[in-house]
Amino acid sequence: MDEIIRAVSKDGFVKISVVTARDAVQRANAIHHCSPTAIAALGRSLCAASMLGDLLKEENGTLTLRISGGGGLGGIIAVSDSEGNVRGMVSNPAFDLPTRPDGKLDVGGAVGKDGMFTVSRDIGLREPYVGSTELVSGEIA
């Protein structure tokens, strides 16, 4: 069962969120038939969207993450509602790269680093709030 756990320090200065999203990631993989590298990238994006969406105060709000890194995976989109429920897709789910020399998946290489990371927050106003930044490494933490 997927869940989000949030905690706040006594002074309110530090907030943490922890997400377990195994079911959502397995469901996404069953739908999209992703390579190991593609599902790692999509799964990380789904977790990030879920954490950020859960922070929305508006009941009908949505949060959308878009990653377009110029790598072989193409674009990645993850959408969350205010309860942390997510859906997402990767443009080229079959794309895969060999593992890195340290044995880990090369998510950064598959995403690419020549592109943008965009977050859109739609809280039911006329236009959504949109913020973008250039990708640095292609890694999705």
Predicted regions and their residues:
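N-terminal functional module of multi-domain proteins
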Residues: M1-S120
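Intrinsically disordered, low-complexity regions enriched in acidic/Ser/Thr/Pro/Gln residues
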Residues: V107-I140
